[in-house]
From Swiss-Prot:
This is Peptide chain release factor 1. The keyword Isomerase does not apply. The gene is prfA. GO terms for molecular function: translation release factor activity, codon specific. SMART domains: PCRF. The modification N5-methylglutamine is found at residue 233.
């Protein structure tokens, strides 16, 4: 690991010289590329330099302990040595995590799809609450939320809502939200006061550039129809709504929220592109995932990943056994504690895999 880190530091110093070179500064495209590479290496180099400082502290303390010291000073040096050794272990782990191969999608924007599952109207209301939760989380992160497609229920819930969240590192923070979310509470539609269980599914897809997925025109079946809101209100007189079917995979996307057929087609294509990318990625991953399955579960979308229990004010993430008694704050977008714990857990799993 140390040799690898030394090579990275040399590369970083070389890049530092290049980005200060007036000739390269004048070539904006080249300069931007080198700056990006430089900023990607910076956290690794800074952590490596911290590691080297700790090693120096340990060596100096051990040298001191080999000399004749008075009792009080020796005690101080031993304390410093123990602290430095503990810190060395922590920083070593952080370096291993920084050296893990990056998920190429981590910096991308995300397309999120929330669908009401079991539980009828109550599930649709829960889907709307999840949408609000992610929107509030995006606000806290200064990310932008854009609704792409909705299908409302009679009580202002969502049978389905598709939206994009744009911002730095959006996918890296939200990718672990894919799965079945479960709610336990007394529904507004329940007169007997009994607690019901309902579900909603969440899919998190990275936004995909045109070049990343090839979509052939002949593979698409594009239909237009009249748009209509929930319960048939706001019915459009023109055929502005668009339904696109990708014939080889059978994936279907409909969009009717925009006023023009052209805008709905653009949105539908953006969603289709993300779904196809996810579909092909999933095919590649299936074989790898089958080997990875262990006591932590498959990470499959069909798995129940989290429960929101209203009577107890409790949120439990079943993948990592984390329970928080702050349901209200979580539903208001206070998700960092859960997301940080998930990131730490899955990074640890990856460290075990790479040995």
């Amino acid at each position: 690991m140390i040799e690898k880190l030394q090579v990275i530091e040399e590369k970083y110093l070389e890049l530092e010289k290049k980005i200060s070179d007036p000739e390269i500064i004048n070539n904006n495209q080249e300069w931007q590329k080198l700056m990006k590479e430089h900023s990607n290496l910076q956290p690794i180099v800074e952590k490596f330099r911290e590691y080297k400082r700790i090693i120096k502290t340990i060596e100096e303390a051990e040298e001191l302990l080999d000399t004749n010291l008075d009792e009080d000073f020796e005690k101080l040096v031993k304390e410093e040595l123990n602290q430095a050794k503990e810190q060395k272990e922590i920083v070593e782990r952080e370096l291993k995590i920084l050296l893990l191969p990056k998920d190429p999608n981590d910096e991308k924007n995300v397309i999120m799809e929330i669908r009401a599952g079991a539980g009828g109207e109550e599930a649709a209301l829960f889907a709307a609450e999840l949408f609000r939760m992610y929107s509030r989380y995006a606000e806290r992160k200064n990310w932008k939320v854009e609704v792409m497609s909705t299908s409302e229920s009679d009580l202002d819930g969502f049978k389905e809502v598709i939206f994009m969240i744009s911002g730095k590192g959006a996918y890296s923070r939200l990718k672990y939200e894919s799965g079945v979310h479960r709610v336990q509470r007394v529904p507004v539609t329940e007169s007997g006061g009994r607690i019901h269980t309902s579900t909603a599914t969440v899919a998190v897809l990275p936004e995909v550039e045109d070049v990343e997925v090839e979509i052939r025109e002949e593979d698409l079946e594009i239909e237009t129809f009249r748009a209509g809101g929930a319960g048939g209100q706001h019915v459009n007189k023109t055929e502005s709504a668009v339904r696109i079917t990708h014939k080889p995979t059978g994936i279907v996307v409909s969009c009717q929220d925009e006023r023009s057929q052209h805008a709905n087609r653009d949105r539908a294509m953006k969603i289709l592109r993300a779904r196809l990318y996810d579909y092909y990625q999933s095919l590649q991953q299936k074989e790898i995932e089958s080997q990875r399955r262990s006591q932590v579960g498959t990470g499959d979308r069909s798995e129940r990943i989290r429960t929101y229990n209203f009577p107890q004010g409790r949120v439990t993430d079943h993948r990592i056994g984390l329970t928080l008694y702050k349901l209200e704050q979580v539903l208001d977008g206070d998700l960092d504690e859960i997301i940080d714990a998930l990131i730490t857990h899955f990074q640890t799993e990856r460290l075990k895999e790479v040995g």
